[in-house]
Regions:
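Secretory targeting and sorting signals
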Residues: 1-25
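Compact beta-sheet-dominated domain cores in extracellular/mature segments
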Residues: 25-155
Length: 155
């Protein structure tokens, strides 16, 4: 009987532990966009209620809070050295940030409406497969039209 109970407990632990993306403990309710992205893009780790990261992809998601919206800088909220793609025009709304360079995949459900190239050199292109939709030189940003499937970063 003890062996059976231990097997059931261990099996339950494996099922619960492997049920979804890795998540840090947080008393706040996780933003629905963060939950959706963690379900849609494998390998994500929940940082807090409004942030998730995909270490293997060099990608992070940030959903701004009311406080974040009032603390915006001249280059949006994209940290130095990153390329960020925003869901709304003029560097507004939730955004994905990329630390790598090359051809960077944009998740299928993500709509890019503006892009910030907060790198010191080169340029970034929002593209639909190979068609360039918009280009942002180093230290600048641009609004984006059309359906973006990838970002091409060139040093």
């Amino acid at each position: 009987m003890r062996r059976y109970a231990a097997s059931v407990a261990l099996g339950t632990l494996f099922v619960v532990a492997g049920a979804g993306p890795a998540m840090a403990e947080s008393p706040e309710e996780v933003d629905p966009l963060v939950v959706q992205m963690l379900e849609d893009v494998p390998g994500g780790v929940l940082v807090d209620a409004t942030h998730a990261e995909w270490p293997e992809l060099g990608m992070a998601l940030t959903v701004p809070t009311a406080g974040d919206l009032s603390a915006r800088t001249a280059s949006g909220s994209c940290a130095s050295g990153l390329i960020c793609v925003y869901k709304l025009p003029s560097l507004s709304g939730a955004f994905l940030s990329y630390s790598g360079c090359g051809v960077l995949a944009v998740p299928g459900d993500w709509t890019v409406r503006s892009m910030d190239n907060n790198r010191a050199s080169g340029y970034a292109q929002a593209r639909n497969v190979t068609t360039v939709l918009a280009t942002a030189n180093a230290g600048s940003w641009t609004n984006v039209g059309g359906t973006t499937t990838n970002i091409r970063c060139v040093f």
